[in-house]
């Protein structure tokens, strides 16, 4: 039986378990023979935890292959936005468990690809998992995985023909200004090279207003840039449009 690649979802399972356990504990207090006010208080306290646990649980289901498979569908959408002859080098920033970069490797069989990620910590991805998935999918010989922060990409200026990133920039902890992370990504893109970034770009507290964001990108030597709301590019279940999930998601694509 052929081994299948294992791709983790964007939802960290330990967070889901925390909310489930707290919800269950608070709910159980309401069933105990204790002070009535304590039971009522526990019930009220349980509500937000139950709400978040439901959203996270349903999001995991919709992102997985046995559910809605939306994580793979979103990666397919990003790949479809890459308008390129396939000859050259691709960089995937925040490669996770390798799903997006492996799709790119299959779509562009003459390309050479690099995936960077910080892995470790409380993330449930690993470099070893990426390498194993790439080997299973038959593209291992064309992909190099490197542990690195998106705020300090370990490559020279103008090294890549295409750069992609999916829901990574807002997670970079060692860069308070997320626009600097985008600037760093564009630093290693060749003149005339293409980029496709998907992130929570509609979160104005993090990235500013859309018009301002696009203007700043033009200051980073970008010759062409377009912004697309993810919800307008593909049909997404309503619960995934929660602001904490994909409600603020937007695709930025263009050329340097």
Model-derived segments and spans:
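Class I SAM-dependent methyltransferase Rossmann-like catalytic core
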Residues: 8-16, 53-77
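Conserved class I S-adenosyl-L-methionine
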Residues: 86-96, 114
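A short acidic, Gly/Pro-enriched loop at the edge of an enzyme's catalytic core
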Residues: 151-163
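Conserved SAM-binding loop of SAM-dependent methyltransferases across substrates and taxa
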Residues: 97-109
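Conserved beta-strand signature within the Rossmann-like core of class I S-adenosyl-L-methionine
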Residues: 192-199
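Core SAM-dependent methyltransferase catalytic element
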Residues: 234-256
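Conserved SAM-binding strand-loop segment of SAM-dependent methyltransferases
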Residues: 138-150
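A short glycine-rich, Lys/Arg-flanked "PGG" loop and its adjoining helix->strand segment in the class I
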Residues: 178-191
């Amino acid at each position: 039986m052929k081994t299948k690649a294992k791709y983790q979802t964007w939802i960290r399972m330990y967070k889901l378990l925390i909310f489930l356990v707290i919800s269950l504990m608070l709910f159980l207090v309401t069933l105990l023979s204790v002070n009535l006010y304590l039971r009522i208080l526990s019930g009220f306290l349980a509500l937000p935890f139950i709400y978040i646990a439901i959203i996270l649980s349903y999001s995991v289901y919709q992102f997985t292959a046995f559910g809605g498979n939306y994580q793979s569908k979103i990666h397919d959408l990003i790949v479809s936005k890459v308008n390129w002859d396939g000859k050259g080098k691709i960089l995937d920033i925040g490669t996770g468990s390798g799903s997006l970069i492996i799709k790119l490797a299959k779509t562009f069989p003459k390309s050479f690809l690099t995936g960077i990620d910080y892995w470790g910590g409380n993330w449930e991805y690993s470099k070893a998992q990426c390498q194993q998935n790439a080997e299973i999918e038959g593209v291992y010989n064309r992909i190099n995985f490197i542990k690195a922060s998106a705020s300090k990409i370990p490559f020279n200026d103008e090294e890549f023909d295409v750069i992609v990133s999916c829901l990574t920039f807002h997670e970079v902890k060692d860069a308070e200004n997320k626009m600097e992370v985008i600037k760093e990504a564009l630093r290693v893109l060749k003149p005339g090279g293409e980029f496709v970034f998907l992130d929570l770009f509609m979160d104005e507290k993090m990235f500013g207003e859309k018009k301002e964001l696009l203007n700043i990108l033009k200051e980073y030597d970008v010759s062409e840039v377009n912004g697309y709301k993810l919800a307008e590019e593909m049909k997404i279940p309503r619960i995934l449009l929660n602001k904490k999930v994909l409600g603020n998601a937007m695709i930025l694509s263009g050329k340097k």
